[in-house]
From Swiss-Prot:
Entry keyword annotation includes Repeat: yes
NCBIfam families listed in its UniProt record: PPR
PPR repeats: 144-178, 179-213, 218-246, 247-281, 282-316, 317-351, 352-386, 387-421, 422-456
A Pfam family this chain is assigned to: PPR_2
Record's keyword terms, sorted: Repeat
Family: Belongs to the PPR family. P subfamily.
Protein name: Pentatricopeptide repeat-containing protein At5g18950
PROSITE patterns listed in its UniProt record: PPR (PS51375)
Length: 483
């Protein structure tokens, strides 16, 4: 049984648990063990009004800490009843934390567990995760289990995966079975952080917990990220039999994965399953399919999908057009590529720099230099070009066609326009000069490349050695080593 399949073993009835958002947020006494006194109940209104007044002062006065006591000399700000009312009336939880720290530093104030839990929960509700972590570290108190579960979720969402796992383990050591939401949040955090080993370690500990659509989504994503796309598909089919639909993202993930490995039969099955479950493929998914087909030299099949999209009333965007144009260029079908190019422009989609470079590269492969220069000049007129991508495309193309001097002109213009040449730029020029027996120019660039701390390619090194007609030992003695 595959790893993914073995995890879909059983489903458990939902456990009754506290909702962390339904904890006490309206503190009236510091301890639940103490009954409210009549005078405390009578003063509740005054505490509420005072809390509103202080909240306003904190928002509007920059140095409220220096004047608050003198403004209200007879008021006991350390009264736990007041602090509870302040937490309710203050919209900004960071202001509440600020007041708490001021209270602790100016009064002999020892907050009780209820106040601490309320403030900690408010920080989590406000997604102030780092502040909540600092608060927990400085106070050293032990939050309620429901808050710890919420804390795990917040840490995971913030990308603090190891911290989330640590708190999750604290709950486990306390004998508390975390909810399916908490478990899923930790697993999803591992996926986002690309920690697949940690994902599978944790999931093995969770095999008896509840399964839901989110868990299936996490498992399939993990299998696809690990290269087990087929196992992910099998898990999808099992989940759907149980009525667990993982959503459009998972279908897109599987489709992309099958496209990358060239399994178009399974890709088609996933696409039809997706539609059957009322998830209509987005243009992004169709772009992935077209790209995958083109990568596997199936441009005709890709164009059939592209054409069907238009026939069915879809409007392919610039990315889809560029993907199809690139596929045609890679195949050498430049006439078809240009036809789509002008169709795209006619529909109001302006080509971007990447699209121009696709066409330039395609025409370089065919040796159509005049068309290359036409596209390049048009790109410059439209405000593109002058970047590392476009400069390297032109330099490599010119050098491959014996036009290293033209390539060198672009190289010189790079520094004038603030574009710093990289190793690809230098290596292309070195090979280009050597190809035209301009070894001195190539050697000069080689030394410049080394001086900049960049690494020459093996092909550039071999071209120099070959044209200088020297052995590797002589080249090494002249400091022409690769590394």
């Amino acid at each position: 049984m595959s790893r993914g399949q073995s995890y879909l073993i059983s489903f458990f009835r939902n456990r009754t648990r506290k909702n962390p958002n339904t904890q006490i947020r309206s503190l009236t006494v510091e301890s639940r063990d103490c009954e409210s006194k009549p005078d405390e109940q009578k003063s509740a209104v005054s505490y509420t009004e005072m809390a509103k007044t202080v909240s306003t002062i904190m928002r509007e006065r920059q140095r409220w800490q220096q004047t608050l006591v003198s403004d209200f000399p007879s008021f006991d700000f350390a009264d736990p009843l007041f602090f509870g009312e302040l937490l309710k009336s203050q919209n900004n939880v960071l202001f509440s934390l600020w007041f708490f720290r001021w209270l602790c530093s100016n009064y002999d104030y020892t907050p009780g567990p209820v106040s601490l839990n309320i403030l900690f929960g408010a920080l989590l509700d406000g997604k102030a995760v780092k502040a909540a972590k600092s608060f927990l570290d400085t106070t050293g108190f032990k939050p309620e289990p429901t808050l710890l579960e919420q804390y795990v979720k917040c840490l995971s969402e913030e990308g603090l995966v190891e911290e989330a796992i640590e708190v999750y383990n604290v709950l486990k050591d306390m004998g508390i079975s975390s909810s399916v939401v908490t478990c899923n949040s930790v697993l999803l955090g591992c996926l986002k952080a690309r920690k697949l080993d940690r994902f599978w370690e944790l999931h093995k500990e969770m095999v008896e917990s509840e399964f839901d659509s989110e868990r299936i989504r996490c498992l399939i994503r993990a299998l696809c990220d690990g290269g087990d796309v087929s196992e992910g598909y099998e898990l999808l089919k099992q989940g759907l039999k149980q009525g667990l639909d993982p959503g459009q993202y998972v279908y897109a993930k599987l489709i992309s994965g099958f496209c990358e490995i060239g399994n178009y039969a399974c890709m088609s099955e996933v696409l039809h399953t997706m539609i059957a479950w009322n998830h209509f493929p987005s243009m992004y998914i169709y772009q992935k399919i077209i790209k995958g087909l083109c990568m596997n030299k199936k441009q005709l099949e890709a164009y059939c999908i592209f054409k069907n999209l238009k026939d069915k009333g879809y409007a392919p965007d610039r990315v889809v057009y560029t993907t199809m144009i690139r596929g045609f260029c890679e195949k050498g079908w430049l006439g078809s590529a240009r036809k789509l190019w002008f169709e795209m422009i006619k529909k109001g989609m302006r080509p971007n720099e990447f699209a121009y470079n696709v066409m330039i590269h395609g025409h370089f492969k065919r040796g159509e230099i005049s068309l290359v220069e036409a596209f390049y000049n048009e790109m410059l007129r439209n405000g593109y070009g002058g970047t590392m991508l476009s400069c390297n495309t032109m330099i490599k193309g010119f050098c491959s066609h014996g036009k290293s001097d033209e390539a060198f002109e672009i190289f010189k213009n790079m520094s004038e326009t603030g574009v710093t040449p990289n190793a690809i730029t230098y290596n292309a020029l070195i090979k280009g000069f050597c190809k035209e027996n301009k070894v001195e120019k190539g050697l000069k660039l080689y030394k410049e490349l080394k001086a900049l701390g960049l690494k020459p390619s093996g092909m550039a090194y071999a071209a120099l050695v070959r044209n200088l007609k020297m052995s590797d030992s002589v080249a090494t003695s002249l400091n022409l080593e690769i590394v």
